[in-house]
Amino acid sequence: QQQQINSLRSRLESTEGKAEQAAAKADQAAAKPSFMDGVTIGGVAEVEMTNTEAFSGTDTSDITLAKVEFFVDTQPHEYLATHVQMLYEDDGTETISLDEAFATLGNTEKFPLYLQAGKWAGPFGGFDTDMSTDPLTKSMGETREAAILVGAVHDGLVLEGYLYNGDTQKAGESNRIDQYGASLGYGGEQNGIAYNGGIGYINNIADSDGLTDALGGNATAINKYVSGAEIHADVSFSNLTLRGGYMTALKSFQAGEVAFNGQGAKPVAWNLEAAYTLPVMGKDTTFAATVQGTQEALALGLPETRYGAAVTVAIVDHFSITGEYLHDEDYSVSEGGTGNSGHTATLKLAAEY
């Protein structure tokens, strides 16, 4: 009987040992970081109902799937991050494009320098907005290319420089990497006031999406590169946010490339915006207003002056409704425009995930 008791005790101790080993392995597996721990998946889907009166007097309305955006961010290593973003926009082509894809090598919490390579919109301009429609500065100057960027940060100061081979090139020259830009930004928070601002330079503003479209067939045969500069800033306090931006070509284009009133154009775009958020019937509601303008930007299809207002209501987490009204004024007849005004009213449903 004693032998049976000893045998049972031995088997019990063996079982307990195996259980402890299994528990230890489970704890180790739980503690070991998984690749999926560093993966973030998200995006947005927007449906818009619009009514537009063009400068020609034509009145149109439509319901569109305005935008679908899907992104995957990963952090496979503490010194490596990646970002891939797909985009569908209602531009008449019904296509899905690779909007952004880049890798960032660095960890600014431990070392101030970093390297970024891939395709994305370069650091030329600040385009944050609480309106539904992008500011005119973005329509004129956003530049999305495959590039290599080197940056440095220190106490809220960010300095970046980048190189790329754009869609535009000089007449008679080979297709090569000869376009570049630089930006300097500063941001922080003090006494409940958050602020951010920056300046940017680009040696060929013609490579922005808006100006490349305006150049048309001349995009690969321009006479010379026209550099551009921009400045932007925003400040937030007590639920109020103020924003502003100014962007300009530093020289005039040739009249045969981008013209204004019979001469070479020197396009300018600017915007001012104010937004205030407060609870309305228990829902966070943002009221925004903007005034924007351009100079010598008729060839880009931009208005001379724009006034607008928008209201965005966060219905539930990740879902909002925005109502926006924009009033645009065209360039005068003597400048090549119609001298007329137009408007666009938009109701947007946006779901983020």
Q: Model-found features: residue ranges?
A:
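N-terminal periplasmic/intermembrane-space "pro-region" immediately following the signal or transit peptide
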Residues: 1-46
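Outer-membrane beta-barrel pore domains
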Residues: 53-59, 101-108, 191-353
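Compositionally biased, intrinsically disordered low-complexity segments enriched
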Residues: 3-6, 77, 294
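Active-site environment of divalent metal-dependent phosphoester hydrolases
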Residues: 168-169, 207
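Compositionally biased regions
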Residues: 8, 15, 24, 184, ...
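Outer membrane beta-barrel
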Residues: 30-168, 174-181, 185-201, 235, ...
